[in-house]
Amino acid sequence: MANVSKKVSWSGRDLDDDEAAPLLRRAPRLGVPAGEAAPLLNGAGPAAARASPHSAFFRIGQLSSVELDDELLDPDMDPPHPFPREIPHNEKLLSLKYESLDYDNSENQLFLEEERRINHTAFRTVEIKRWVICAMVGILTGLVACFIDIVVEKLAGLKYRLVKDNIDRFTEHGGLSFSLLLWAALNAAFVLLGSTIVAFIEPVAAGSGIPQIKCFLNGVKIPHVVRLKTLVIKVSGVILSVVGGLAVGKEGPMIHSGSVIAAGISQGRSTSLKRDFKIFEYFRRDTEKRDFVSAGAAAGVSAAFGAPVGGVLFSLEEGASFWNQFLTWRIFFASMISTFTLNFVLSIYHGNAWDLSSPGLINFGRFDTETMVYVIHEIPIFIAMGVVGGILGAVFNALNYWLTMFRIRYVHRPCLQVVEATLVAAVTATAAFVLIYSSRDCQPLRGSSVSYPLQLFCADGEYNSMAVAFFNTPEKSVVSLFHDPPGSYNPMTLGLFTLVYFFLACWTYGLTVSAGVFIPSLLIGAAWGRLFGISLSYITGAAVWADPGKYALMGAAAQLGGIVRMTLSLTVIMMEATSSVTYGFPIMLVLMTAKIVGDVFIEGLYDMHIQLQSVPFLHWEAPVTSHSLTAREVMSTPVTCLRRREKVGVIVDVLSSTASNHNGFPVVEDADGTQPARLQGLILRSQLIVLLKHKVFVERSSMGLLRRRLRLKDFRDAYPRFPPIQSIHVSQDERECTMDLSEFMNPSPYTVPQEASLPRVFKLFRALGLRHLVVVDNCNQVVGLVTRKDLARYRLGKGGLEELSLAQT
């Protein structure tokens, strides 16, 4: 494979030879002089530090010994796949700091014994507990959404009333600059506080959280992503961001919030609060937590948009790595409970206890399908709007990509991140004030349709229409663009608003604040969509079908689809949020067109940020041009193996060694020197840590020093924060003891032959949610180990198949 000639890190500093040397410990190959470097099988240069050739001899407790054909290790052989030799950007890196989650149960003796003890009644009890947890997730997610909505409404109302009174007073007496300073200062103060708690307390709470949850459901362990502290900072941060007037929405973070709630409730304890409620202990493993997090994400979507079916489809389309019929029912149940809880509580809050008219945080309002019909000749127009949405979405993502690269390189300190967020808040308020001040688009005031009408230089009984878009929460601005009657907006007002808000939203996404991109995208699209509808109405002579509100809806769908590239779930979400199936087909056409056009230029926003964070994310399928690659070409070698009965000192050394960077170790039979050591099972680092902590040694067991036999509960109690090996004290005498791994290892790990193609390996690994896949030869000897990073290194780029470089950062 090709060597990578340049190592790029976020610090922008290359590794020189002296720095790269310790990362590789190359064993000499037979026939290669001792001082000569052996070639790399896996194609990564010194910076990758992941593959070294096979040693000539089997060293139990250290390296696998199976040699490969000499021709495969020939340094003079041309690489069969010409990969690029220059890696210029961060998205060409794959970070080694991310670990994988265990979405495959280790079927060792302890696990099988416990499963055999579960009778029909116990099994039914476990199933009932699953439904109870999903109900609790739905209720709590709905309550959190209510809390966010009520607090935002109160604080935003207080801020806008204060600024409005100030503007009205100074409009008469002069001195509107004081109003500008007040507005900018209030926005900056809220955002300063919101950014500070995110940057200094829990950085993973930044953004919408959707990319992080996608990675979690994909099988990547993102530190702190589902902790209680993250939830508290997320909720507080999104309130402060929205009240601070940023071009953000509170709907996206609800997905992250629901996921954190699900992850916490399903474990029956809080490691942050150090409280164990001794319930739901059976679900303390990654496989169970993954399913509940899927339900939490769906409940978040349901609470945000009042779209329970859309929530289920969102979990399916955007994240879930495992799916079945029973899981679908539970996720749908959690989504329905979430939207009902939100509906019920908000109805009581608004004084309509039995009305149940608030199904989500945002309600797009019901479109009158009798008057706002669409005709067959509008379908090409909708497709054209999808093309525009795809192009604008690609421009948005491209600008945000370069902005994110700049932030990674130069705005990586928390204090600088807070300063940038505060600056954006002040600039947003200033831009809004200047546009409102400059606008002369005055419209007659219609009852209470406008929440905070600004008169400024308009006549009595009129309001400034530019203020409706800026001087309001983004959710209410979207509804205004959808439902305000024709003639409510001047085309110049909509054009200026679209242009300014587009760049403000692009600048805002990626700040160190808790915020989402759903509502800003809808608002941008609704603005240019309404402008499109006004133009069409003018051209057609105010035809009945050319309603600006209808085209505002299509523009909103096109813009959001062009940015995030979701089709199935977004179609249903928009249908449920508008309470109308009539526009289902046009919305689907618009979203599909926007995705197809946008994908021609650049990835979707969430996938782009996942790549920029160098996360080893596995897509649904392997790269289409990767069939010529085999398992032996992508696997990690050499492999650290352990014997069934291994010395404690060897295990401690293996776990302490930085060279043993895998979290799974093949277990081989005790070789007597005459027979090759064959694969017997696989044991995880976390299991070895628990065994060492409880000192499960053969000698102690034979002397009766073990108080009891280790149970599966002991491993669940240590989950998920297993102690580091440095915290476990092992005396010199204990190092000479022996540990029997037979009872704790997985005796039937998944294996593949070394000739298996990459797509076949990828399909097995991805479909089963594996963390380790052992590569064996015809004699069942360990040849290598395939991990998530080995598969994620290969992807289809513009010039064909690309191989990413591995980095420690």
From Swiss-Prot:
**Which stretches of this protein does UniProt put in the Cytoplasmic compartment?**
1-130, 602-809
Major localization listed first in the record, in broad terms = membrane
Q: Looking at the UniProt record for this protein, which Gene Ontology cellular component terms does it annotate, in alphabetical order?
A: intracellular membrane-bounded organelle; lysosomal membrane
Q: According to the UniProt entry, where does the motif Selectivity filter part_2 sit in this chain?
A: 249-253
What's in the keyword line of the UniProt record? Antiport, ATP-binding, CBS domain, Chloride, Ion transport, Lysosome, Membrane, Nucleotide-binding, Phosphoprotein, Repeat, Transmembrane, Transmembrane helix, Transport
**Site-annotated residues for Mediates proton transfer from the outer aqueous phase to the interior of the protein:** E251
Residues with site note (Mediates proton transfer from the protein to the inner aqueous phase) = E318
Q: Which Gene3D superfamilies match?
A: CBS-domain, Clc chloride channel
Annotated TM spans: 131-163, 178-201, 227-245, 251-268, 326-345, 379-409, 414-436, 491-511, 516-539, 583-601
Q: Where is this motif: Selectivity filter part_3?
A: 516-520
Question: How does this protein sit in the membrane?
Answer: Multi-pass membrane protein
Residues annotated as carrying Phosphoserine in the record are S9, S64, S805
Binding-site list for chloride = S208, F518, Y606
Where is this protein found? Lysosome membrane
Q: Name one GO molecular function term.
A: chloride:proton antiporter activity
Point out the residue ranges buried in the membrane yet not crossing it. 210-217, 292-304, 308-316, 549-563, 564-566, 567-578, 579-582
Q: What does the subunit section of this Swiss-Prot or TrEMBL entry state?
A: Chloride channel 7 are heteromers of alpha (CLCN7) and beta (OSTM1) subunits.
Question: What's this protein's family per the entry?
Answer: Belongs to the chloride channel (TC 2.A.49) family. ClC-7/CLCN7 subfamily.
- What is the stated purpose of this protein? Slowly voltage-gated channel mediating the exchange of chloride ions against protons. Functions as antiporter and contributes to the acidification of the lysosome lumen and may be involved in maintaining lysosomal pH. The CLC channel family contains both chloride channels and proton-coupled anion transporters that exchange chloride or another anion for protons. The presence of conserved gating glutamate residues is typical for family members that function as antiporters.
Name of the protein: H(+)/Cl(-) exchange transporter 7
Q: Tell me the name of the encoding gene.
A: CLCN7
